[in-house]
Amino acid sequence: MKIFFITSNASKVQLANERLNRYGIEIIQHKADLIEPQVFDVETVAAEKAKQLLGIVKTPFMVEDSGIYIEKLNGFPGALMKPVLDAIGDSGLIKLMSGESNRNALVKSVLAYCDPEKDLIKTFTGNYNGSISESIRGDMTRGWKVAKIFVPAGETKTLAEMDDMEWQKFLGDFRKDDHYEKLGKWLKSAFA
């Protein structure tokens, strides 16, 4: 089965292929101009992006959106992570958390799968709990916008501080039930 991934990010396509090939799914990059909905909820953003493409893309496709929800900030910035980080950076988020003891945060990633022939949009969510560090730490972003300030649950290092072995352990834990895994399992059962 082939699915278009509507993204300009080739690294996302490579990751999707790594994750979904074992389910017999080939991911092909396709670029399209999308209006990014400026709403708080990543599920809404992913579904709205998929709806924009329903009449344009004729074969199965998927879009992705991610956000970080900081508990003490009532979930801010959520799906607005990219524009917020572009505006205030990691240091701005750290400053917003100044003096706060509750630094809990949730990284949420959503894939919206769309089959235009069936007029179907289905979303798959992956969550990862952690906290916001008190300072910017580490050098490796590893493709995560919040890598220098996000500390995974049960860890003491930010993602950017992790060595390769620690990073692989984190990925292994994250991937057990992430959005790619959920999509792959669903497609396997739906088209078996």
Please describe what each predicted stretch is.
Residues 2-4, 11-192:
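Anionic-ligand binding patches
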